[in-house]
A protein has these predicted regions:
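Transmembrane-helix bundle of Major Facilitator Superfamily
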Residues: 2-192
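Helix-loop junctions on the cytosolic side of multi-pass membrane transporters
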Residues: 187-207
Length: 207
């Protein structure tokens, strides 16, 4: 059997490595939002006056919606295209970050965090799948996945630090505005440096 060009690993170029940096930033931000709010709890509690139950939902609902939507978003990306889903998710993440930042009630912040979770669930499966298709050389793919995993680990650690810095100078909602420049960068560079990929054998979409 003769190997096709698609089967032969090729070295990644400048475009792929720039694309990886964009994807890594998105992954870092996705994880950051799990922890960035922790130090803001006293300030937002004083401002929004949430009940104990509402405060738990404000903190936890993002993670719940991310975890509950990952499989669905992965299948959706297979059907409509990974890059397309990533762009939709990045735009939604930016908009819902604004809603969260300027929430005027506990209920509004809970709803915004839930929508952030749905948007965040588009980032993890889309970024990893795109990395697999951008890097076909086994060694380069291993490096790229290592960078992606490192971004996840860094996001968890950096979230409280950046959140604390923002709270030192601004109001509690400013911690959500960290997403805006990253999502803007993803939306500008994504169509230029990221390939599109659809799975012709995508499974049924389960809600």
């Amino acid at each position: 059997m003769t190997a096709t060009n698609h089967d032969i690993p090729t070295k990644a170029g400048r475009r792929e490595w720039i694309g990886l940096s964009v994807l890594a930033l998105g992954a870092l931000l996705y994880v950051m939002d799990l922890t960035v709010l922790h130090l803001a709890v006293p300030a937002l509690s004083a401002d929004l006056q949430p009940t104990s139950a509402q405060l738990l939902w404000i903190i936890d609902i993002y993670g719940f919606f991310v975890a509950g939507s990952l499989v669905t978003m992965g299948t959706l990306g297979d059907r409509i295209g990974r890059r397309k889903l990533l762009m939709i998710g990045a735009a939604a993440f930016g908009v819902t970050s604004l809603l969260a930042a300027f929430s005027t009630s506990a209920e509004m912040l809970i709803a915004s965090r839930a929508l952030l979770g749905l948007a965040g669930a588009t980032l993890a499966p889309s970024t990893l799948s795109l990395i697999f298709h951008m890097f076909t050389d086994p060694k380069e793919r291993t490096i790229a996945i290592g960078v992606w995993i490192g971004a996840f680990s860094a996001g968890s650690a950096i979230g409280p630090v950046l959140g604390g810095v923002m709270l030192e100078f601004f109001w509690w909602g400013s911690v959500f505005l960290l997403a805006l420049p990253v999502m803007a960068l993803l939306l500008v560079l994504g169509p230029r440096v990221l390939p599109e990929y659809r799975d012709p054998d995508a499974g049924r979409l389960d809600i």
